[in-house]
């Protein structure tokens, strides 16, 4: 069974966010989130990522019944990840040390597989 552990991407990060923008470039993956309580924008940069998937909010209800630990904010690291298992099954060169980061909001869910923690910084509107 997948288990969701709360992840804090930044010491000042608020738990409830909305994903504003997703940009993938050769320099990596950038996810821009807006905090509900403060309206601040937090940029989350994955300099290297192996894979990511984006799902709509209808996924959350079904996933919550099959997992442990959801409902404690927007940011998680997933243990016993089915996404990692699927990635290894379909990949020609399985990698070591891959972690599954998940950002879950009211309208969008992002799952990112990466070997390093992302960089984060607050940005101006």
Model-derived features: where do they sit?
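Surface-exposed, interaction-prone regions used to assemble/regulate multi-protein complexes
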Residues: 1-125
